[in-house]
From Swiss-Prot:
Post-translational modification: Under oxidizing conditions two disulfide bonds are formed involving the reactive cysteines. Under reducing conditions zinc is bound to the reactive cysteines and the protein is inactive.
Main localization, broad class: cytoplasm
Name of the protein described by the UniProt record: 33 kDa chaperonin
Family, per entry: Belongs to the HSP33 family.
Keywords recorded for this protein, A-Z: Chaperone, Cytoplasm, Disulfide bond, Redox-active center, Zinc
Gene Ontology MF, one: unfolded protein binding
Gene3D superfamilies in the cross-refs: Hsp33 domain (3.55.30.10), HSP33 redox switch-like (3.90.1280.10)
Gene encoding the protein: hslO
One Pfam family recorded for the sequence: HSP33
Source organism per UniProt: Streptococcus pyogenes serotype M49
């Protein structure tokens, strides 16, 4: 089961979130039938949103959009504070040549664009923030967002590793943030440790990558685990929701679906689930609109 572990240095100088998101990204790949590069780009976006959602309280909904002018198109993810995330990538078929080490490149092909976040607190006034893509690698772009929009300097690492068949082998990441209590000496020590950390891909390839990430972040510094919470890919779409959407269409449009298509098929963008509405279903909707 996927999980996020929240921890804090015993000194109170900084905190860290460490994630195992392997099942989340694997299910997203299965749902959308994504090829290698699309899988990694979508996976990184999902992991970034899992981190962002874990930082919120209440019943907030968090939307992350990675909008570039590349062949990936838009990448959209929606998460809640209960560990659920869903998402899709506009172009599922991007399969760019890997590096010599087998890693999939994303940044060089993302193009210019923006990292957009929308946090809906349920009050009717969602908070929206837009920052430019810095590298297109998504992790660095997320870190830049946290620094610029939330005024919280953060170290972010996230990645998706694929096997020889381009299926998700492991996915996960981390976030480290300095807290106000940190002294200059503690900040300097923290920055030095981060600079010396192995690459995120190397840590994810470890036998137990969650422990490997924590060890790399804290080193010999004492810390305590605050919580361990489950994560999952979960879509909240339903037939009732799409039926309500059909109710908003003009009667003429619904009648055209009956006359021309003998019904309607609606496919959820986030999970690929198909919902069929036959002629009788559409006629009932028209009748309810009367």
């Amino acid at each position: 089961m996927d999980k996020i572990i929240k921890s804090i240095a015993q000194s109170g100088a900084f905190r860290a979130y460490v994630l195992d998101s392997t099942e989340t990204v694997a299910l997203a790949q299965e749902k959308h039938n994504t090829l290698s590069s699309s899988t990694v780009a979508l996976g990184r976006t999902l992991i970034a949103n899992q981190i962002l959602a874990a930082n919120q309280k209440g019943d907030s909904k968090i939307t992350v959009k990675v909008i570039g002018d590349s062949s990936f198109g838009h990448i959209i993810s929606v998460a809640d504070t209960k560990g659920h995330v869903k998402g899709y990538i506009q172009n599922t078929g991007v399969d760019i040549k890997k590096t010599e080490t087998g890693e999939v490149l994303v940044g060089p092909f993302m193009g210019n664009g923006h990292f957009v976040t929308i946090i809906d607190y349920g009050t009717g006034n969602p908070y929206t923030s837009t920052t430019p893509l810095i590298t297109g690698e998504i992790g660095e772009d997320f870190a830049y967002y946290l620094t610029e929009s939330e005024q919280t300097p953060s170290a972010i690492g996230l990645n998706v590793l694929l096997d020889e068949n381009d299926k998700v082998k492991v996915a996960g990441g981390f976030m480290v943030q300095v807290l106000p209590e940190a002294s200059e000496e503690e900040i300097a020590r923290y920055e030095k440790r981060l600079q010396e950390m192995p690459a995120i891909s190397h840590l994810l390839a470890s036998k137990n990558h969650v422990d490997a990430l924590l060890e790399a972040i804290y080193g010999d510094e004492p810390y305590k685990r605050l919580s361990e919470e489950p994560l999952s890919f979960q879509c909240d779409c339903s037939r009732e929701r799409f039926e309500a959407a059909l109710m908003t269409l003009p009667k003429a449009d619904l009648q055209a679906m009956i006359d021309e298509d003998k019904g309607a098929e609606i496919v959820c963008q986030f999970c690929g689930t198909k919902y069929q509405f036959n002629e009788s279903d559409l006629e009932a909707i028209i009748s309810d609109k009367a």
